[in-house]
Amino acid sequence: MMIIEPHIHMLSRTTDDYTAMYNAGIRCVVEPSFWQGVNRRHPGTFFDYFQLSLEFEHTRARRYGVDHWSCISVNPKEADDLPLAMETLAGMAPYLDHPRCVAVGEIGFNRITPNEEIVFQHQLEMAKARALPVLIHTPHDTAQTRKVDGVSRILDILREFAYDPSMIVVDHNTEETMPLTRKTDYWAGLTVYPYSKLNPR
């Protein structure tokens, strides 16, 4: 049986992880764009990252028997710097049109700010223009942010957006947000980690 890993960030992993995944039956992975630990300061650093994901990482994975695909986006964690985000979106088309790009994502909210919403909506439009699937990041619960509020706002935006629900994954749901997402026709994603988000218990 072939297993597909639909959401993994391999740029921060070693080739030992590819070997372990292959041994477990994983033959295909999809890597969404993500925040690398510090905010980028220039559009060019985003573009270098997109190229690395689309070309180098695909080649690296293939050496270990794994087919690697990418989702391209300005991640919500970096969407609050609106001038930088918009300049990056203006140059993102070649990466979205790359044959190894299979979706736009992750997009959505980090702190549920107006700037994040602007960037989210622009990227939804970019996906729709290309008939690409969309992978949506829902915010984490923090002292300042409630995940359920972020999911509610995301679902409101998606209703206004009127894109084929079968093309949209609302990811990182929890027991608090799953009832909201399951009332819609969007795919409801769960994230399993050993010690955070959902875990085996």
State where each predicted segment sits.
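Mid-domain alpha/beta scaffold segments of enzyme catalytic cores
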Residues: 1-157, 161, 167-168, 172-176, ...
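H/E-rich (His + Asp/Glu) clusters that bind or coordinate divalent metals
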Residues: 184-201
